C-alpha cells in the first residue's frame, strides 16, 4: 500500500504501457515481438534523454524550449569540426561542451535579467536555431543531406547492441538511473524541489539557487549534445534540423510523467515511462497504418485524458467532500 501511495502514478503509467502494447498487438502481431519493441526505441529514445533533465528544470519552476535548436546546433557543429579534420575523439567532447555552453547561456540570461524562462529560451531557440542554419550554410551542407562521411566506427555505434539491447536504449537507462539518483537521493535534488515550490522561501533559506539553476540548464544542454551525437551516428549525417520535432514530445512526456508545469513536483521514473508510452503510441499507430496527422491528434488527446485523470485522482478527496455536501443539501431540502 505504501508503495502504491509513493509510486501510484508510475505504476499507473506502467499498466497503461503494457495495455497499449497488448492492444496494438491485437491489430499487428509484430508489436508483441520483443526485438521490434527493443529496436524501435532507437527512433524516439533520444527524446527521453533530453526529457529527463528537462523534468528537473520544470520541477525547479523553470522551462527550456530551446533544446531542439541546441540539438541541431550541436549536430552541425560536430559535422563541421569533423569536416575540418578534427578527430572524432576530440570532436565529440567539444560538441558536449557546446551543449553545456548553450545551457549556461540560458541560465545566465534567466538569472541576470529575471525574465520568465519561457521568454528567454524562446529567444535562444531562435538564436541557436539560426546559428545552426548559418553554420550549415557556411559548410555547404544541404538541408536533407547534411554533412556525411563519418567513420564507420562512429556511424555503427548507435546501431550496435550491448547485452542484447540497442546502445541508445542502454544510454537512456543509464541516464534514468543517474537523474533519478540526482533528483531523489541528493541535496541538490532536494534544492530543486524547494526552489520549485517557492523560490522566495528558497532564497531566504540561503539555498544556492543560481548554482542549482546553472547546473540544471547545463545538464539539459549536455543531454541535448548527447542526443545530437546519437542522432548523427544513427542517421549517418549531421543536419541542423535533427532536433526540430523534439519540443512537444519531450514536454508531453514530462507533463504526462507527473511533473507540475508550475514547478515543485515531478518524477524521473514517471517521465521515463511516459517517453515509452508516447513513443510506442506513435510506433503502434504507424504499424496499423494511421496517418501522421491523426497520430499527433491522438497523442494530444492521450495527454489531455491522462492529465485530467491525474488531476481527478489528486483532488478526489475534494470531489468526495463536494458530493457529500450536495447530498446533505438535497436530504435537508
Swiss-Prot record:
The keyword Membrane applies. It is a multi-pass membrane protein. Keywords: Cell inner membrane, Cell membrane, Membrane, Transmembrane, Transmembrane helix, Transport. Signal peptide: none annotated. GO terms for cellular component: plasma membrane. Its main location: membrane. One of its GO terms (molecular function) is transmembrane transporter activity. InterPro entries: ABC_transp_permease. Pfam families: BPD_transp_2 (PF02653). The chain crosses the membrane at residues 7-27, 45-65, 67-87, 90-110, 118-138, 162-182, 212-232, 240-260, 261-281, 288-308. It is found in: Cell inner membrane. NCBIfam families: PRK15038.1 (NF011612). Part of the ABC transporter complex LsrABCD involved in autoinducer 2 (AI-2) import. Probably responsible for the translocation of the substrate across the membrane. The complex is composed of two ATP-binding proteins (LsrA), two transmembrane proteins (LsrC and LsrD) and a solute-binding protein (LsrB). Belongs to the binding-protein-dependent transport system permease family. AraH/RbsC subfamily. This is Autoinducer 2 import system permease protein LsrD. It comes from Yersinia pseudotuberculosis serotype O:1b (strain IP 31758).
